[in-house]
A protein has these predicted regions:
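Residue-level detector of anion-binding/catalytic polar loops
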Residues: 75, 98, 120
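Conserved AMP-binding/adenylate-forming
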Residues: 22, 37-83
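ANL superfamily adenylate-forming
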Residues: 105-130
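Conserved ATP-dependent adenylate/AMP-binding module captured primarily in the ANL superfamily
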Residues: 83-113
Length: 130
């Protein structure tokens, strides 16, 4: 992973990810992941290995979320996009996730659960400034 972080800084204009929206550079990935990390930290200096569960579709936002959690000092817990709520709840509870980061399309599935269990829920797009 350190190699990828190093590439992001040494070759910012190289393509890091190709997805349905097109080509994304390491610079774009680095900036988005930094914004996500900053928002997740919420004024703290480190997440201190808090587990952050995330349900984000493959593409730039998935990798930016993963990197953002790592940059903030958290442990990323990817959630399977096809799991039903009871299976997701099991993973979230078993890992003791401190927060959830999701794509808007999963809001209906997880919003009530997050509220009932007092787990902070973040839309990935709200964690990014630009």
């Amino acid at each position: 992973m350190l190699t990828r972080f190093s590439q992001a800084q040494q070759r910012p204009h190289s393509v890091a990810i190709l997805d349905a929206q097109g080509a994304h550079t390491y610079e774009s990935l680095w900036n988005k992941s930094s914004q996500i990390a900053h928002q997740l930290l919420g004024g703290s200096s480190d997440l201190e290995q808090a587990r952050i569960a995330f349900m984000v579709s493959p593409g730039l936002n998935y990798v930016a979320t993963l990197w953002g959690i790592w940059k903030a000092g958290g442990i990323a817990v990817p959630l399977c996009l096809s799991y039903p709520l009871p299976s997701l709840a099991y993973v979230i509870e078993d890992t003791q996730a401190a927060a959830l980061v999701i794509d808007p399309e999963y809001l209906v599935l997880l919003q009530g659960y997050a509220q009932d269990n007092r787990i902070p829920l973040h839309l990935v797009e709200d964690l990014q400034v630009g």
